Regions:
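Short glycine/proline- and acidic residue-enriched helix-loop micro-motifs
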Residues: 108-129
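Beta-strand elements within well-structured catalytic alpha/beta cores of enzymes
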Residues: 5-9, 54, 150-156
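GST superfamily/GST-like fold recognition
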Residues: 158-162, 189
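Phosphate-coordination/substrate-recognition cap region in phosphate-metabolizing enzymes
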Residues: 40-108
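Acidic, low-complexity terminal tails and accessory targeting/binding regions
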Residues: 2-3, 87-99, 143, 147-150, ...
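His/acidic metal-ligating clusters that form di-metal
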Residues: 136, 145-146, 152-159
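Loop-to-helix element that buttresses phosphate recognition and phosphoryl-transfer chemistry
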Residues: 7, 13-68, 122-135
């Protein structure tokens, strides 16, 4: 019986987060609040015996992961997984969100109507492509777990985690951008997904235990 808990964390706040710029495959540095949030998250999770720690290969995610595990007493192997990267926003990357909302009609489709979003407009990814690779990422992680039971840290990004967690929680991916339907992921929020696979199963089951928890940040 395989029984794994995946701790899914959004990276810490970055400079482009506070400037309301699209990041995607590009990167901007963690702010001081972002670094503090990662450290506080690490303190919150310091007694969790993580077997492994994954992140996307993007700097903001790797740094957040490293700040978190630095607070842990255990020696934790780290890995980068490309499928955990943020959604590729193509030509929108680096652009200010208010400008895109005002001047680019398809951007508002991206925000409010995922099923009809045409990614050819910005030469980036669409939501189903993102969902497919995020599912692949989780499959890779659970298949490569060094033990049958335990905890694994996974640091990724807001857009992709929101989509993934909505679907794993039984939600409709077409509605996941609706704040009343499923919330956006906050910086250094903690979500836990359990994976169970019995010995006679070829494929296990993911279930969301909780998502987007930031209670630990309110105590910093």
């Amino acid at each position: 019986m395989k029984d794994l808990n995946l701790y899914l964390i959004r990276h810490g706040q970055t400079e482009w987060n506070i400037k309301d710029q699209m990041q995607g495959s590009q990167n901007s540095p963690l702010t001081q609040d972002g670094i503090l949030g990662a450290k506080v998250t690490g303190q919150h999770l310091k007694n969790v015996p993580f077997m492994q720690a994954y992140s996307s290969p993007q700097q903001r995610a790797m740094e957040t992961r490293d700040y978190i595990i630095h607070e842990n007493d255990n020696v934790i192997p780290t890995f980068e997984l490309a499928d955990l990267r943020e959604m590729d926003f193509g030509t929108w990357e680096g652009q200010h969100v208010p400008m895109l909302k005002k001047e680019v009609p398809e951007f508002n489709t991206y925000l409010t109507d995922p099923a009809n979003f045409d990614a050819s407009v910005n030469q980036g990814e669409n939501y189903l492509e993102v969902l497919s690779r995020m599912k692949n990422a989780l499959t890779t992680i659970v298949q490569n777990a060094p033990e049958q039971n335990g905890n694994i840290l996974v640091v990724s990004h807001g857009t992709v985690l929101r989509l993934l967690l909505c679907v794993l929680n039984g939600g409709d991916w077409r509605l996941h951008r609706d704040e009343d339907y499923f919330p956006r992921m906050l910086n250094t929020s903690v979500s836990v997904v359990n994976y169970q696979q019995s010995d006679d199963q070829t494929e296990g089951q993911f279930s969301v235990k909780f998502f987007n928890n930031v209670d630990h940040l309110n105590q910093k």
